[in-house]
UniProtKB/Swiss-Prot annotation:
<keyword id="KW-0479">Metal-binding</keyword>
<dbReference type="Pfam" id="PF03484">
    <property type="entry name" value="B5"/>
</dbReference>
<dbReference type="InterPro" id="IPR040659">
    <property type="entry name" value="PhetRS_B1"/>
</dbReference>
<dbReference type="GO" id="GO:0006432">
    <property type="term" value="P:phenylalanyl-tRNA aminoacylation"/>
</dbReference>
<dbReference type="Pfam" id="PF17759">
    <property type="entry name" value="tRNA_synthFbeta"/>
</dbReference>
<keyword id="KW-0436">Ligase</keyword>
<dbReference type="InterPro" id="IPR005146">
    <property type="entry name" value="B3/B4_tRNA-bd"/>
</dbReference>
<comment type="similarity">
    <text>Belongs to the phenylalanyl-tRNA synthetase beta subunit family. Type 2 subfamily.</text>
</comment>
<feature type="binding site">
    <location>
        <position position="364"/>
    </location>
    <ligand>
        <name>Mg(2+)</name>
    </ligand>
</feature>
<feature type="binding site">
    <location>
        <position position="365"/>
    </location>
    <ligand>
        <name>Mg(2+)</name>
    </ligand>
</feature>
<dbReference type="InterPro" id="IPR045864">
    <property type="entry name" value="aa-tRNA-synth_II/BPL/LPL"/>
</dbReference>
<dbReference type="GO" id="GO:0002161">
    <property type="term" value="F:aminoacyl-tRNA deacylase activity"/>
</dbReference>
<feature type="domain" description="B5">
    <location>
        <begin position="302"/>
        <end position="377"/>
    </location>
</feature>
<keyword id="KW-0648">Protein biosynthesis</keyword>
<dbReference type="InterPro" id="IPR045060">
    <property type="entry name" value="Phe-tRNA-ligase_IIc_bsu"/>
</dbReference>
<dbReference type="InterPro" id="IPR009061">
    <property type="entry name" value="DNA-bd_dom_put_sf"/>
</dbReference>
<dbReference type="InterPro" id="IPR004531">
    <property type="entry name" value="Phe-tRNA-synth_IIc_bsu_arc_euk"/>
</dbReference>
């Protein structure tokens, strides 16, 4: 959930009323927001840097830090927040956004070469904008919040804003080799090629995290004007030539993307929120974007959608009984203009409310406007007896019984390193059905475990100073890649136990296997034709040769049991012999 910081005095001035902290907190709660903290810039810097001296010159102006729902992009800046609150209070009607047409539109042409890096682009113009220091800061902060939120740290969408008066259209969006691109980056004094720019910003506190998005690509995306002046190198940085200042009057906004829908949402959000600062409020100049196939699409769309909802169903879902007119008024206060049409409501969804994608989202806004605290508590109209999920119930029963058998339970991490389930167990990681993390933050958490064994062995290492024997177990899920499932992977509940002593003690884990099967009422298969479990000799690189067996049930391998291989013990820094058993319990549910 993103958090925005707004200066209290500016906020109250825009709202036209002064509130106490408690009163404003109540207003936020009624609107579905939360006042997270009342602080100052000085306190924030002191907290972040842990040094009072570093914040000595910081402002002591009161700042409200407000938690915003992750899908309410229209509330991520002061302008959007104020408009939303004023409409909610009935002090302002929802704005109507309009296009203004000049004799000639600005044009952005997408070159086919961009298909291999960031294939989509959208654009718009805000005319006759008046920036103050506060609105300028808000404009920059909104872009940052959008980049971190819907833009997914610029991987899906990158925003560029430029002083249009310093540029000459039409504009072109191309993809070129890094050394073919040369320009002066924002707030720098010398020109750099694409390759030099990557090296220069590799240690930059804010920008270094975005470099990997395009660094390894043979081409970098770049936007030029008619004079071949570089506007931006998305998603890294804008050019210094067209930077926005307080004197900027006409703003050219471009968004390049790997997701066209997200780009349209971002563009709509920016132009709707900051068209408030145009001389002619809530007006936007559209741009023509020429696609690689020659077709032309006009942006922004600023589409006002309509959704029809049932009054009866809205009341039933929320648990209230209000007339259609009252529900329409509630929705209008939530920035969704609604009109009564028989037993239904026709709801107009403005371009600022891209979070509304289903009738349920509208019902939620009705509930917020009505007030969750005002909904009367009531017992459900029907009775239903709940019961525990069978697999979880079996797990709880086995945990208790295995513990009573003398084993100590361990709860280990679901994520582990590639080496833990691969090299250390004498296995090829590429041959395992493992689910890999796309962007692991540490070497310890690279894949989802496919076996419980590494977690128990690492627990043994952490407790090797304890007296022997050490007998550990865990009953939990592993995750196995499976293309036949909808998400490409499935969970499997397993029990795993390890015995660590001066001797391997295979009979200890074998005895535990027998005890668990006894508890499950599964007999030992002593003759052909009878149903039960048995052991079948096998070889596994994780186990000592000749001392490993498959655990079989109804002719199917459900696990393994054996003495661990010395190289496995050495890889996990263990010096005492160990035996282990691991098998799935799902067939017994």
């Amino acid at each position: 959930m993103p958090t925005i910081g707004v200066k209290r005095d500016l906020l109250f001035e825009a709202l036209g009323k002064t509130y106490t902290d408690d009163e404003f907190q109540d207003l936020c709660f009624a609107f579905g927001l939360e006042l997270d903290e009342v602080t100052t810039e000085k306190q924030m810097l002191t907290k972040e840097q842990g040094d009072v001296a570093a914040a000595a010159n910081a402002s002591e102006e009161i700042i409200y830090r407000i938690d915003i729902p992750a899908n309410r992009y229209d509330l991520l800046c002061l302008e959007g927040l104020v408009t939303g609150l004023l409409v909610f209070q009935g002090k302002l009607k929802p704005p109507k956004f309009q296009f203004v047409e000049l004799a000639k539109r600005q044009v952005l042409k997408i070159d086919p070469s961009t298909a291999q890096i960031r294939p989509y682009a959208v654009a718009a113009v805000l005319r006759n904008v008046t920036f103050t220091q506060a609105s300028y800061n808000s404009f920059i902060d909104l872009q940052d919040k959008l980049h971190q939120n819907i833009c997914r740290k610029r991987t899906l969408v990158a925003i560029g804003t430029h002083d249009l008066d310093t540029l000459q259209g039409p504009f072109s969006y191309e993809a070129l080799a890094p050394d073919q691109i040369k320009f002066k980056p924002l707030n720098q004094t010398k020109e750099m090629t694409g390759s030099e720019l990557m090296d220069f910003y590799s240690t930059h506190a804010q920008l270094k995290q975005y470099l990997p998005i395009i660094r390894e690509s043979p081409v970098y995306p770049v936007i030029y004007d008619a004079n071949r002046v570089v506007l931006s190198l998305p998603p890294i940085i804008n050019g210094d030539h067209s930077k926005i200042t307080l004197k900027t009057k006409n703003v050219f906004i471009e968004c390049t993307a790997t997701d066209r829908t997200k780009a349209k949402v971002v563009l709509d959000t920016i132009v709707c929120l900051f068209s408030e600062h145009c001389a002619q409020k809530f007006t936007v100049e559209p741009c023509d974007v020429v696609q690689p196939d020659g077709s032309v699409i006009s942006y922004p769309e600023l589409e006002v959608r309509e959704e029809r909802i049932s009054v009866k169903r809205a009341n039933a879902y929320i648990g209230i009984d209000e007339p259609a007119e009252k529900l329409a008024d509630m929705l209008t206060r939530m920035y969704l203009e609604a009109k009564v049409d028989g037993d239904s409501l026709v709801v107009k969804i403005p371009p600022t409310r891209h979070d509304v994608i289903h009738a349920c989202d509208i019902y939620e806004d009705v509930a917020i406007a009505y007030g969750y605290n005002n909904i009367k508590k009531s017992l459900p109209a029907f009775m239903q007896i709940a019961k525990q999920f069978p697999l979880n119930k079996l797990t709880e029963q086995l945990r208790e019984q295995v513990a009573q058998a003398g084993f100590t339970e361990a709860l280990t991490f679901t994520l582990c390193s590639r080496d833990d389930i691969g090299r250390k167990l004498n296995k090829n990681i590429d041959a395992l059905p493992a689910v890999h993390i796309g962007n692991p933050k540490t070497l310890e958490f690279q894949v989802v475990r496919t076996t419980l064994l590494p977690g128990l062995l690492k627990t043994l290492v952490a407790n090797r100073k304890m007296p022997l024997p050490l007998k550990l177990f865990e009953i939990s899920d592993v995750v196995v890649a499976d293309e036949s499932t909808e998400v490409g992977a499935r969970n499997e509940r397993r029990v795993c136990a390890v015995n660590c002593n001066k001797t391997a003690g295979f009979e200890v884990v074998h005895g535990l296997l027998d005890r668990v099967m006894q508890l499950l009422s599964v007999p030992w298969k002593s003759a052909s034709g009878t149903k039960g479990y048995y052991l079948q000799a096998t070889e596994d690189p994780s186990y000592f040769p000749g001392r490993c067996a498959n655990v079989m049930y109804d002719g199917v391998v459900i696990g393994k049991i054996g003495v661990l291989h010395p190289t496995v013990l050495q890889a996990f820094e263990l010096t005492t012999p160990c035996s282990a058993v691991e098998f799935t319990i799902e067939p017994f549910v």
